[in-house]
Regions:
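Bacterial N-terminal signal peptides
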Residues: 12-24
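PDZ/PDZ-like peptide-tail recognition elements
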Residues: 32-95, 168-170, 184
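Short helix/loop segments within enzyme catalytic domains
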Residues: 32-61, 159-162, 238-287
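Active-site scaffold of zinc-dependent metalloenzymes
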Residues: 82-100, 115-118, 174-207
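Conserved PDZ fold ligand-binding element
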Residues: 105-133
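PDZ-domain C-terminal substructure recognizer with occasional recognition of PDZ-binding tails
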Residues: 132-175
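Catalytic Zn2+-binding segment of zinc metalloproteases
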Residues: 201-202, 209-211, 218-234, 264
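Pan-zinc metallopeptidase signature
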Residues: 281-310
């Protein structure tokens, strides 16, 4: 899948926040806060991405603390609905939309609806919400939280149902490759050197095994350092030559290994490639090996897979 410059993905990431609740205008029409359930595209991407990162620590050259949090803030929304969102969700700091089961956040007792107001006893500095919806505030908070976790546990000051409490988030490392859900009616995915992203259409169409390979393939591009130059797409038209094709082979091999280590079946990779080949047949050959060759290589990699191997 194509490597996109980081700023391009970050400009689009805010949409994943609104997708988690439905469109903001729909969300505020409800009588009670709406949170994504476990089978929503948002939580599936977050959960599968967490498992891939957590279960492949030994295969990644660079690690960072994982939280298992799906977050939002007022800056994530259009200015026209921010007041309603603040009232409906009690949102003044950084809000918790979802928590990945079994994650550090889940073990800390964090819940959807919690509003994070402080770190280690110090209030979070507010980020001025801009004239348009933006992911900047969440990205800044996530980076700050990860940096603090690098030094050990972090005490979070949280408002829950109008009452303050303190929860302790422990450091739990995994691959330094974050995941994101982007809008899009076409099944597609990208990586930009930091994020592995899939479209809403892909997340809705793919089963867990297929989505595990799609995210694993994109995370592999991040882990292998492929963002230095553009390379071909798993689903779309690529622009590279022989070197790009080799990088796609590398990402397939590492991606299926990562997905197997996280508990997803190799058959999902085959189904995904078949499906995407039918949807994007005109562009795959520019940077990708043939689908049959890719599936054969994936089967070979899966046959040699050992959970303990690095």
């Amino acid at each position: 899948m194509p490597v996109r410059e980081s700023f391009t993905l970050r400009k689009r990431l805010y949409v994943a926040i609104s997708l988690a609740l439905g469109q903001p205008s729909v969300a505020v029409a409800q009588d009670a806060p709406q949170f994504p359930d476990a089978r929503s595209p948002q939580m599936r991407v977050a959960t599968i991405g967490y498992r891939l990162a957590a279960m492949n620590r030994q295969r990644c050259p660079r690690l960072e603390p994982l939280t298992g949090l799906l977050l939002h803030d007022l800056g994530s929304y259009d200015p026209a609905v921010r007041q309603q969102i603040a009232s409906r969700y009690g949102l003044a700091g950084v809000g918790v939309l979802g928590v990945v089961p079994g994650s550090a956040a889940a073990d800390a007792g964090l819940r959807p609806g919690d509003d994070i107001r402080g770190l280690d006893g110090k209030p979070i500095a507010p980020v001025n919400a801009g004239p348009t919806a933006s992911y900047d505030g969440i990205a800044l908070f996530t980076d700050m939280l990860v940096q603090r976790l690098m030094h050990g546990e972090v005490a979070l000051t949280v408002m829950r149902a109008g009452e303050p409490l303190t929860v302790t988030l422990l450091r739990r490392d995994g691959c330094a490759a974050r995941v994101a859900l982007l809008p899009g009616r076409k099944p597609d995915a990208w990586s930009d050197g930091r994020y592995a992203a899939v479209t809403q259409a892909l997340a809705e169409a793919a089963g867990d095994d297929e989505l595990g390979f799609a995210l694993g393939h994109e995370m592999a591009h991040v882990v292998l350092g492929h963002a230095a130059e553009p390379h071909g797409a798993l689903t779309g038209i690529g622009i590279g030559g022989k070197r790009s094709r080799e990088r796609e082979r590398e990402a397939d091999r590492r991606g299926v290994t990562m997905s197997l280590a996280a508990g997803y079946r190799e058959a999902g990779a085959e189904r995904l490639l078949d499906r995407l080949a039918n949807a994007h047949a005109s562009g795959l050959s520019l940077t990708h090996p043939s689908v049959r060759a890719r599936i054969a290589a994936i089967r070979e990699t899966a046959a040699a897979f050992s959970p303990e191997a690095r």
